[in-house]
Amino acid sequence: MKLTPREKDKLLIFTAALLAERRRARGLKLNYPEAVAFITAALMEAARDGKTVAEVMHYGTTLLTRDDVMDGVPEMIPDIQVEATFPDGTKLVTVHHPIP
């Protein structure tokens, strides 16, 4: 299987997000990389599903709460930026304060 660097990055994000999803389902609090991967993968999937940039940005603030992550993690993530593939092309999505 031949993958571009971007495709490899997407697979890495997905794998980390899957691990984070499983840990969250078991009741564990997510650490920094898990929280970032969880949110990033959800944003990429929402874009792929056809949501608008504004909808994806808002959606990114609803995925995790302070109760879902370890202490200090929300302050470590002031924003998340991801290049997501929308039906009309690739766009940069920025979510400010993704964990309110």
UniProtKB/Swiss-Prot annotation:
Signal peptide: none annotated. GO terms for molecular function: nickel cation binding; urease activity. InterPro entries: Urease_gamma, Urease_gamma/gamma-beta_su, Urease_gamma_sf, Urease_subunit. Belongs to the urease gamma subunit family. GO terms for biological process: urea catabolic process. It catalyses: urea + 2 H2O + H(+) = hydrogencarbonate + 2 NH4(+). This is Urease subunit gamma. Pathway: Nitrogen metabolism; urea degradation; CO(2) and NH(3) from urea (urease route): step 1/1. It comes from the Bacteria.
